[in-house]
Amino acid sequence: QSLTDTEQGKAIGLSYFNERGFTDQTIKKFQLGYSPEAWDALSVAATEAGYSKDYLVKTGLSVAKDNGQLYDRFRNRVLFPIQNVSGRVIGFGGRILTSDKNKPKYVNSPESQIYDKSNVLFGLFTAKTEIIKKDNCFLVEGYTDVISFDQSGIENVVSSSGTSLTSGQIKLIKRYTQNITILFDGDAAGIKASFRGINMIVEEGLNVRVVLFPDGEDPDSYAKSHNADELNAFLEKNSQDFIHFKADLLSKEAGSDPVKKAGVVKEIVQTIALVPEQL
C-alpha cells in the first residue's frame, strides 16, 4: 500500500519500478512494494494491525534493539515478496535505492519457521503452470530477471535469488519438468562458480541446457530491449547442451597447455559420470 498510496512511495518506490519498465499490471502480479524511510513505519503499522512484536522479529520484518524497540529491516528499500508454491508470502528481498556503499544492495529475510531459502524459488508460484505447459524451466539469477521475462511473455522462469542452487530447489523444479535451461550473462567467473550447482542438477537426472547472453547484457536488460519474438528466437538459437557448453568454455581456457587439457577431459568425464544410469 505504501508504494501506491503514499507520496513517498510513489515518488521513490513506484518511480524506481517504472524506470525499470515494469507496468502497473506487473507490479500488481508480483506484489512489489516499498518500505518507507522512517525507522519503524512498518513495525508500527503491523503492531497496530494486531501483529505481535515477537512475530515481527521472528519473521524478520523487524529487528529488535537492545531496549526492545523495533526498527524495520527493509526501511527505505523496494520490496520483492517471496512466495511459496501456494502463493503465500514467506519472505522478502529488499533493494536499496541510494548509493550508500556502507549498506548492502540487497537485504533478504532471515531464515525462519516459514522461510527456508534453500527450499524456495522466486517466481515459482507464478511460473509453475507455464513450466508444466512448456516442459522447461528457465533459471535466472535475480528478481528483476524473472519479472522482465514474465512481462515479455515468457512466464516459465524462476530465480534462486542470488544464492547458490541447492538440491531442495532442484527437487522443486523437478516436480514440474525434467528440463532446465540456465541463463547466464557474460561473466565467466560467475559461470564457473555455478558449475557445482549445475552438476547437482545433472546428478538429479534432469536435462540441462545453457544460454549465454552477449557481453554487457543479462536476462533483464535483454528482455527490455527486445520484443517477445526476438527474445524467444534468441533463446532458441543460443540454447546448448550443458556438457558441450562446459567443454567449450574450459577448452578455450586451457588453450594448448597439455596438462590443462587433460584436466578439462577429467572434469567433463566427472560430469558425465553424474548422469543417473537409468537415463
Regions found by a protein language model. Name each.
Residues 1, 36-176, 180, 193-194:
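Phosphate-handling DNA/RNA-contact segment within nucleic-acid enzymes
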Residues 1-8:
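Conserved active-site segments centered on acidic
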Residues 27-36, 279:
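Terminal amphipathic helices with adjacent charged low-complexity linkers/tails
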Residues 180, 188-208, 212:
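Phosphate/diphosphate-binding loops
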